[in-house]
Amino acid sequence: LLEFEHIIQVNDLGNEAITVLTREQLWRGLALRAQEPDKFNQGLSCSYKSLSENEFLRTISTGESSFYERVVLTPEVKIHTETTGDSQQISAESTAEIEEPELNSLFVRFTYKRELGDNNSEINIGEHLKSAYVQIDQDAIAMIRVLAESNLFDQAIN
């Protein structure tokens, strides 16, 4: 079992060269990533079915593999994702939670828990996954920043 978390600083209030994102902008970006992860990772295709205003089931396909997940949104706070149903897929869950220790000082805490499978190879799969998660999350925050600075959220959604 891999259990891992990391934090990304979104706003550096001491660096005037970086635009300060609002909590709403950050939330819009994180929610967009949850609903349409294929806009953040071109190797994916995604479809989803709404269960309620803040909950949906999504299917993410990459190559010949598909993953089925339940996603629960707590608006402007966190997004929780958990695999569902199919016994052929690994059990996994993740959370992206906005933290604001002081006004406009935004961070996102990413938490992951997943099975690693029975692969006993010499490669440390857990360390590779941790590195991949950090890179993907950093790229997502960078993309959210570009969308916010360029006022492109509405175009990205369509």
Please place each PLM-identified region on the residue numbering.
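Hydrophobic ligand-binding cavity/cleft-lining segments
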Residues: L1-K49
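Hydrophobic residues positioned within well-ordered beta-strands of beta-sheet architectures
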Residues: F4-H6, F56-R58, E69, T81, ...
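Hydrophobic/aromatic beta-strand elements that line small-molecule binding cavities or substrate pockets
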Residues: I8, S45-Y48, F67-L73, S91-E100
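Beta-strand elements of well-folded, non-transmembrane domains
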Residues: V10-D12, E64, Y112-L116
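Short, highly charged C-terminal tails/helix-capping segments
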Residues: C46-S47, R145-N158
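Glycine-rich portal/gate segments that line the openings of hydrophobic small-molecule binding cavities
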Residues: Y48-S87
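Beta-strand/loop substructures that line and gate deep hydrophobic ligand-binding cavities in soluble
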Residues: D86-Q138
